[in-house]
Amino acid sequence: MTKAYNIIHHKFDVVVVGAGGAGLRSAFGMAKEGLNTACITKIFPTRSHTVAAQGGISAALGNMGEDDWRWHMYDTVKGSDWLGDQDAIEYMCKNAPDAILELEHYGVPFSRTVDGKIYQRPFGGMTTEYGKGKAAQRTCAAADRTGHAILHTLYQQSLKHKVQFFIEYFAIDLLMEDGECRGVVAWNLDDGSLHCFRAHNVVLATGGYGRAYFSATSAHTCTGDGGGMVIRAGLPLQDMEFVQFHPTGIYSAGCLITEGARGEGGYLVNANGERFMERYAPAAKDLASRDVVSRAMTIEIREGRGVGEHKDHVFLHLNHLSPEILHRRLPGISETAKIFAGVDVTKDPIPVLPTVHYNMGGIPTNYQGQVIIKDGKNHNSIVNGIMAIGEAACVSVHGANRLGSNSLLDLVVFGRSSALKAAELIKPASPHKPLQKETLEKIINRFDKVRYANGNILVADLRLKMQRTMQSHVSVFRTQKLLDEGVGMISEIRNRYKDIKINDKSLIWNSDLVEALELDNLLDQALVTVCSAAARKESRGAHAREDYPDRNDRDWIKHTLSSIDDSGKVVLDYKPVTLTTLTDAISAIPPVKRVY
């Protein structure tokens, strides 16, 4: 089959797949360390989804009041509902201030205080004094376009350090032999050629799989391509049942309104004009963690206190803030609300609804980015030749629920740590192990089979069935009945993938084929998500079970590992959460009842 395709071979020290914040920070970090580095991306780097991150990036700088990285760690552990690994959380929070200063030195145009310091705003779940003090102003912001500012800066650094980019290349599958990764195969959308990239290390920075749902803040490119490749390689994914619903997606459009809007003083109201969050989170109110706010909004709507003709959303008020503050600190969402909701935020409230936003689960890694698996009694056995970072990975610093502004921090901290580890492991220009012909042949055969699929179902129709099923059956609130139905429905939809029809057989800019390959990735991750959720019989973080409303620390402080066997059956396993810290700089944080 390989003879039927124009295959171009490359050899690099490292290949990064994905050019968002994590991928770019990793790529130029590796190039800076002297490694011959390639970066494969299916879209132009500055169109990666990091560009849509609005509110900011967290670090205990203390510019707007006293702060400490230990308080940041406490908030992150609590936010994770004690499913986050405390060694990785310590590493992230301790390294956060240096990561911000590094970004500033690279040229990120952060907003400033009157005395020239980096401006920091309050964000949900961020406190002082280990949760006993006032709200922390910890989120460093570049107005409400922080991701845009960071992504462009990291791309400039990547060009400076001569990362070799392969832009508009679609990653098809990993080259796996003897339980280790030897490279990746990609398809050049512009000329139709296939490329075999040999590498001592492949770094997956491919983002989340938000597009498995019908309504999501994610770009249409967020199809979890890294997770799909990992599942097909026979490796597990971790904690896939934990899907974050952001409280404030614009009603009907799904576009994000940053949590920074509430950080600047915005508040939610129901049909009675009541600030209902005061009932659900008396201390934090509208700045409780995202899972808490999304559940509160859903309850208000269910109980008939929603707004609008169908009483199916709530209002976010910013119109009490001065136009000068809105213009200076929230210019992007003012524009977004005007375009997608027809609202002038200086005069009227924004209609909002909880919307799928982030995947806490992903490819299991350690805090140095290395992919790990459970091997007998060793729960953290390293898979050679492969790393994962960013939303594609599950380190796990976010556990069952991510705090807002910890995601951009995750990207730059673990992007950097993966680069340092790769430099430690790889000698530049060292020879590659030989690759068996069958390894490449297997990947080409799968690609060819999808390309020439001539069944009866259009990719768009099957994708819509998956998205609607996930939206209705694996949502903010869950029950065994709904989840079991969801398992059956997603399994059936996945089985029907073999009956898809590809009308366009060409290799140049074939969007039909791209979407078919993306759907394959989405379906596998949708299936392990719903199966993992059906098995976890407790409520923790973003996984809220109406039939199991309480957190069960005795049985469920453990990570879910999910894989798909050759017969298409989901296999679930579990491993302990790391409840010990990395160093003696802070004591472990024991589980307590999580209230805001």
Swiss-Prot record:
One of its GO terms (molecular function) is electron transfer activity. GO terms for cellular component: plasma membrane. It is an enzyme of class 1 (oxidoreductase). Pathway: Carbohydrate metabolism; tricarboxylic acid cycle; fumarate from succinate (bacterial route): step 1/1. It is a peripheral membrane protein. Its main location: membrane. It catalyses: a quinone + succinate = fumarate + a quinol. Its cofactor is FAD. GO terms for biological process: electron transport chain; tricarboxylic acid cycle. Pfam families: FAD_binding_2, Succ_DH_flav_C. FAD binds at residues 18-23, 41-56, 225, 391, 407-408. Substrate binds at H246, T258, H357, R402. It comes from the Bacteria. Its EC number is 1.3.5.1. InterPro entries: FAD-dep_OxRdtase_2_FAD-bd (IPR003953), FAD/NAD-bd_sf (IPR036188), FRD_SDH_FAD_BS (IPR003952), Fum_R/Succ_DH_flav-like_C_sf (IPR037099), Fum_Rdtase/Succ_DH_flav-like_C (IPR015939), SdhA/FrdA/AprA (IPR030664), Succ_DH/fumarate_Rdtase_cat_sf (IPR027477), Succ_DH_flav_su_fwd (IPR011281). It is found in: Cell inner membrane. The modification Tele-8alpha-FAD histidine is found at H49. Part of an enzyme complex containing four subunits: a flavoprotein, an iron-sulfur, cytochrome b-556, and a hydrophobic anchor protein. Belongs to the FAD-dependent oxidoreductase 2 family. FRD/SDH subfamily. This is Succinate dehydrogenase flavoprotein subunit. It comes from Rickettsia prowazekii (strain Madrid E). The lineage of its organism: Bacteria, Pseudomonadati, Pseudomonadota, Alphaproteobacteria, Rickettsiales. The gene is sdhA.
